[in-house]
Structure formats: structure tokens, C-alpha cells
């Protein structure tokens, strides 16, 4: 990634962001307009914390110590656009419901699964899914299920390792290589793994640049 692209994120991420909508089912989705970047991952993988760190607003996406708290598709956009006509934001960030919470009621899990699958299959403006993996645990069985779902939906996705401050720094390159090996033959996987720590602000600049490149926004 070039130095120019790595520093071009400021016009987009250097402004306030706002929450615009929680979507419990497909009929509540906003009209298709700006490109969408979605964040998926297991419960408590750090999705909300990562979104807050990306935009520099601690309270934007609600964080919780209770797994499975996010039960909707939560939409966030940069402030300063009317949302009407051509005055649309360049993109929207979407915080998806976490998966893999064993104590969640089955009907809730079924509803989340349907919402996520329908969204992945039927949203033309969805540009990429960033699948968050806890660096302490690596890719687990239900992560593999989501990878398969994304492959079947032909939805481009990229792996983002979270909480790298919780493991030894020397182990991060090895974990990246192990993760790359696991996704090497998956058709929809973007062949580059990002590593981040929301708490230590590690890897955020690279993730911002990757997102800007994905949506074609370079200032």
C-alpha cells in the first residue's frame, strides 16, 4: 500500500460520524445509496470498539461486556451530508450482529442468521465485509461457517485480527501467516490480513487506508 493511500483517509475519517439507523430486518434497510463496508465477527471480538477507534469517537458504536448485545445492522455515516439527491456520504459503516454466543436464545440466533445472510446476498451497495478475528483465539469453527457463507454469497471479505495487544508482539507475524494459509483457497477472501489493536491504536491507519481504497475514496 503506497504512502499516498495510507494518508488519504483524513478527509473521510477526520470528521464526525453519526448513527443513522438500526435494522432488525431487511425491510428496514435504508435506500441503497452510498457504498457500504460491513464489520462481522464473533460476539465480543471487538467490532464496536474497532469502529469507535476508526472514527475517533468512543461512544459512537455501543460497546458492551454482554455478548450478543448487537442484534441489528447498525448504520453509521460521516456527518455533513443531507442524504438527499446527490448529496450522499461516500460510504456507510455497518456494525453487524455478533455470532457464536452460546447462551443466546435459539430464536434470536435464527433471526440474526437470517438477517445477516439476507443482507450479504441481497445488498448491491455492500462493497466488502471485514471479518474480525480475535488474535487470542484465531479462526474458530463458527468463523469457518461465516467464511463459507461469504464464499457462497460471492461477497468480498478481508480478515482483520483484533486485540493484538493481548498476545506477544512476536507472535503476530506468525498468526498472520497461519490465517493467510487458512483462507488461501477461499474464493471471496482478499489475500491480505490486517492486524489491529483498538486499545493501543495499532493498525488503524492501515485499516482506514484499506477501507478508503475499497470504496475508491482518496480525498
Curated annotation (Swiss-Prot):
GTP binds at residues 41-48, 68-72, 95-98, 162-165, 196-198. One of its GO terms (molecular function) is metal ion binding. It comes from Allorhizobium ampelinum (strain ATCC BAA-846 / DSM 112012 / S4). Necessary for normal cell division and for the maintenance of normal septation. Its cofactor is Mg(2+). This is Probable GTP-binding protein EngB. Keywords: Cell cycle, Cell division, GTP-binding, Magnesium, Metal-binding, Nucleotide-binding, Septation. GO terms for cellular component: cytosol.
